[in-house]
Amino acid sequence: MQNMVILGATGSIGASTLSVISANPFAYSVYGLVANASVDKMLALCVAHKPKVAHMVDEAAAKQLRAVLPATLNIQVTTGMNDLLGLVTAAEVDTVMAAIVGAAGLVPTLEAVKAGKRVLLANKEALVMSGELFIEATKRSGAVLLPVDSEHNAIFQCLPQEVQANLGRCDLAASGISHILLTGSGGPFLRSDLATLAAMTPAQACKHPNWSMGPKISVDSATMMNKGLEFIEARWLFNTQAEQLKVVIHPQSVIHSMVQYRDGSVIAQMGNPDMRTPIAHCMAYPQRIHSGVEPLDFFKVGQLSFYEPDFERFPCLALAMEACAQGQEATTVLNAANEIAVEAFLQGQIGFTQIAKVNEACLVTVPKRPMGSIEDILALDAQTRVYARETLASIA
């Protein structure tokens, strides 16, 4: 029986994880649930899954949850960073699902790694912001790191065992691998006239053709910044050089990514677009469990198509690839700027195409300095957010 803590329990990844746990009740136990401020959702999850600990990032939300949670459930409600870090490093905890969206997930995810936990990584920003520090912490602690993102999980499944066992430190060329092919659907605006993009609304941007996701990730998919962040994440997970990584537009989201070998072979991971599949794979690795996802019906798939990315349509993807080439400081800046820009777009403060403008302004202007600690990373993140907000004020 694995005791699990779910960071981001009330989000889409959290819901999918709990669904897989419910389908395999004799193998997994919910030890802790972590959410920001969604009291009603957390209450329902506590009643359904009966964790030992329910942690609310928002103090007022924690107080509300304590007031409405039935005492008979005997669930400890906590709040504050110290309690959160104590939860993810607790001796009773075996596995941590890291699914808090954005920079907010970095510190607890890194602490779980330092504690040597089995970490299921759905928070891509942890590697985007602190790739080298994160990988080094994994190496020192002996933590097991498994990628949950559908693309990185697909790549992982297509790799030989010696690479799987050495994430972040592997040598792809030595294992006969020539390229990693990172697929992306192109989002809801793949076929839209370029002239119409500036007027696209948050509701339109969040209407993904294949996947069900939260608002921030949905907008990132529409700009293809999501693929850009995944490009950066893949660089750290698989220790790649720039020339070993390629982005492929694949609108059907049937092939979740591919690995090309020196001999000309290409191994692809396929399946219906449902996050329960990669989640179940990570939870059970190296075994397999039931995910609740219907297997792919090849007779209904139809045509599979592939295209090169259009950087005029997707400038955020180009910015992410450029930042990846520049290094860790640039990717930290880009991630912080993008979080501010996307939130502003969702609130109606800026237009869709202005997201890329904010990101580019920050990437060009914010001073980059060497980062040797988590404190350095968080300081650069905070500085970038200040500049991004100033940029918003100038273009709004």
Swiss-Prot record:
Its EC number is 1.1.1.267. Its cofactor is Mg(2+); Mn(2+). Signal peptide: none annotated. NADPH binds at residues 10-13, 123, 125, 214. InterPro entries: DXP_reductoisomerase, DXP_reductoisomerase_C, DXP_reductoisomerase_N, DXPR_C, DXPR_C_sf, NAD(P)-bd_dom_sf. GO terms for molecular function: 1-deoxy-D-xylulose-5-phosphate reductoisomerase activity; manganese ion binding; NADPH binding. It comes from the Bacteria. Pathway: Isoprenoid biosynthesis; isopentenyl diphosphate biosynthesis via DXP pathway; isopentenyl diphosphate from 1-deoxy-D-xylulose 5-phosphate: step 1/6. It catalyses: 2-C-methyl-D-erythritol 4-phosphate + NADP(+) = 1-deoxy-D-xylulose 5-phosphate + NADPH + H(+). Mn(2+) binds at residues 149, 151, 230. Belongs to the DXR family. HAMAP family: DXP_reductoisom (MF_00183). This is 1-deoxy-D-xylulose 5-phosphate reductoisomerase. It comes from Shewanella baltica (strain OS195). The gene is dxr.
